[in-house]
Amino acid sequence: MSDAVGPDPVVQRGDAVAAEPVDAAEGLSKAVLLDESDGAPNFAMRRFELAPGAEVPRHTNAVEHEQYVLAGEYVVGIGDEEHVVSPGDALLIPAGVEHWYRNAGDEPGAFICVVPNGDDAIELVG
């Protein structure tokens, strides 16, 4: 047993977290799985779903994003390159780097996205 002082452990059941539409892109939804309101001191973990035919416009974020693809096959544009991603792929999108998403397939795409807690300024590009 440890004498370390820190946050209490949390187990968040996926079906207990409601997904909400994301205003910036039709067909994109987000569920916040863990963040500072749950006692997570450093990072927020979110689950995104990208519906078939959905596109997220080019944008930048003030904070880095680490992503892990759960389902589907879709395109992620990062900088000047496009990448087709599928389950098991992991991505690092550094702060300030332009990126976008496009799901041209028939199945939803889903990914986990981890970001630092705190404010994130999002700027649409173009």
Please state what every model-predicted region is.
Residues 30-31, 46-61, 95:
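Conserved short histidine dyad/triad with adjacent acidic residue
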